[in-house]
Amino acid sequence: KVIKALICAAKNGNKVTVVIELLARFDEASNINWSKRMQDAGIHVIFGVEGLKIHSKLVHIGTRHGDIACVSTGNFHEGNARMYTDYTIMTAHRPIVREVNAVFDFIEKPYTPVNFKELLVSPNDMRKRLIALINKEIKNKEQGKEAYILAKVNHITDQALIEKLYEASATGVQIELVVRGNCSLVTGIPGISENIHINGIIDRYLEHSRIFIFANDGDEKYYIGSADWMPRNLDNRIEVLAPVYDKEIQADLKRIVCYGYRDTAKGRIVDGTGENRLWKGFRSTLCKGSTPAFVEADKTNVLFRSQEELYKEYKNTL
């Protein structure tokens, strides 16, 4: 549907540029076919950057009334949309929109020096800025200020980030993570990672979103985007994390992470044992029972299934 809409836009006289990554697992043939159809419709199709796989999910729309940008955690793929949990932010915030456009410029003219202030972009500066965000939490904790990290990712295997999280934990920063897949971080090591706790969810839908929350001494910083904490995402791919400033959306993102962290029905303990034991009972210093679903689960001591609870809540608001 997205591709057909782009083709329709081009046929209606709009200038359309599409960046498509041909090296997508299991979708190479489909991507080649759709690329030809878009080119036949007059769309300018770009096939990525040599040496850098494009993994970011971005849209930039120019209108007479102002430009709009979208940054997503998931692909524009109808099959994935039925099976994956993902989130997209659509914004007219001018600094973010300008920088999303700059990412497209970078893709068209690769290795051109580009500076980003709003977006965290790989391979430009994402690693450096993530480490800076963690360092800020360490510094705040040392100064007696509020400091914690909440995050939801697919994988954590980057050694430099893992070492930095260990340093934060050793300083006393509380770190609560939802990690669905590969995790090289070992929790519960005395003096090193005893302040890090990880829940992993395997349920009906594939957990695919990436959400990052930093306490920042009470003025929380929120980011969503395409990047996991892996060397390939930080060094060898074009990835984008975007800040989220809207308080209502921030609250929703925090609820998503906390629901995942508090899942006692499909959540498993991610630690060094590899036993994948299920969580039993509530355990969190950051995700306390502030929603009706949490309160009811605590009161009745029933299993809390995050995907089911989120589905019901979203369904009731539509």
Region locations from a protein language model:
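Short charge-dense sequence patches
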Residues: 80-88, 111-116
